[in-house]
A protein has these predicted regions:
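Non-cysteine beta-strand/loop elements that form the S-adenosyl-L-methionine
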Residues: 188-203, 274-281
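Auxiliary Fe-S-binding modules of radical SAM enzymes
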Residues: 1-63, 231-320
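Alpha-helix-loop-beta-strand connector modules within alpha/beta enzyme cores
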Residues: 158-170, 221-229, 301-307
């Protein structure tokens, strides 16, 4: 059995100076720009183009495209999540906000009851604002928007109300990275921490496993824009994330070469990129020995060690 390589040094914190933290969206709120952005975002729902699928349906009239979401966002759950990255969960948890439905079609999705079957409750902007404020009252370190790409207008609506109610937590955009340029433009100056989960670099793999051949092009373009907006991840003196980019990547069986391509892209973006190489893949949803035999197994230790070797060889050093 191969000996595991030495793990990279602990993530190097780009530590923010002392003083009170102010989330980015407060400046937009004071100028009135946050409400204007929310109104502009809602206009995108008339012929929906929130994500690269650009379905063109009128969601304001409850027409449904790929994400099968109409005017209101549906919330599956919201709670203080202690299982996220340590820089997000801290001691009191990350204020996770799980939205129902999704704009992708991952055949291996482990949350298909939420993403495909739509488990959740349609919620108004006012109700979502109350949820955000409750998470703040419970002591959560941030508001963590999980699978948000198809409900950006609804998030902005709710955020504008929550800020008026006293919300002061950093905003985490926890996305599959399948976002449109228009959505990201509206989020510039709103989001503090972008956390894209970059899945595939090869269009053929994206088509087979996500039902989105254009995913790699759209995702890498989105990640580059996210980095332009917020830069490398910065933490406070307690190690809590305050601003910047944190990238997730799910290591999958037999697809090490694709992982290497993604890591190479991220190193080209910045060698200070904070990365979490996820190893919890397991066959789920539509994956079986008959349907997708090539990914019908867990990731091996050898595959993970090889991914770490490549990570180090690129000069990357911030590994969660």
């Amino acid at each position: 059995m191969r000996r595991p390589p030495r793990r990279p040094a602990p993530p190097r914190s780009l530590t923010l100076p002392g003083g009170d933290f102010e989330p980015a969206y407060l400046a937009l709120h004071r100028s009135g720009e946050l409400r204007r952005r929310a109104a502009e975002a809602l206009d995108l729902l008339k012929a929906c183009r929130l994500c690269p699928r650009a379905c063109g349906v009128d969601r304001l009239r409850e027409a449904a495209g790929v994400c099968r979401t109409g005017r209101l966002a549906a919330v599956s759950s919201f709670f203080g999540h202690r299982g996220e990255e340590s820089c997000l969960s801290g001691r009191r948890g990350s204020g996770a906000f799980f939205f129902s439905r999704c704009n992708l079609g991952c055949v291996f999705c482990q949350n298909c009851r939420i993403s495909r079957m739509g488990e959740g409750v349609p919620s108004s902007a006012g109700q979502m604002a109350e949820m955000m404020l409750r998470l703040q009252e419970e002591g959560c370190h941030n508001i963590n928007l999980v699978t948000p790409s198809h409900v950006v207008p609804q998030i902005l609506e709710a955020l504008a109300l929550a800020v008026e109610g006293g919300l002061r937590l950093p905003l985490v955009y926890n996305t599959s990275a399948y976002d449109s340029a228009e959505s990201l433009r509206l989020l510039d100056g709103v989001v503090d921490i972008y956390m894209p989960d970059v899945k595939f670099r090869d269009p053929a793999l994206a088509e087979r496993y996500l039902r989105a051949r254009d995913y790699p092009e759209a995702a890498l373009r989105s990640v580059a824009e996210m980095h332009r907006q917020v830069g490398d991840l910065e933490t406070d003196r307690q190690g809590l994330a305050r601003r910047g980019l944190l990238v997730r990547h799910l290591l999958m069986p037999g697809l090490l070469e694709d992982t290497k391509k993604i890591l190479s892209f991220l190193a080209g973006l910045s060698r200070d990129t904070w990365i979490n190489i996820l190893t919890q893949y397991r066959p789920a949803n539509q994956v079986s020995a008959l349907t997708f035999p090539e990914i019908n197994r867990p990731v091996s230790r050898e595959e993970y060690y090889a991914a770490l070797d490549h990570f180090k060889s690129l000069g990357l050093h911030r590994l969660d």
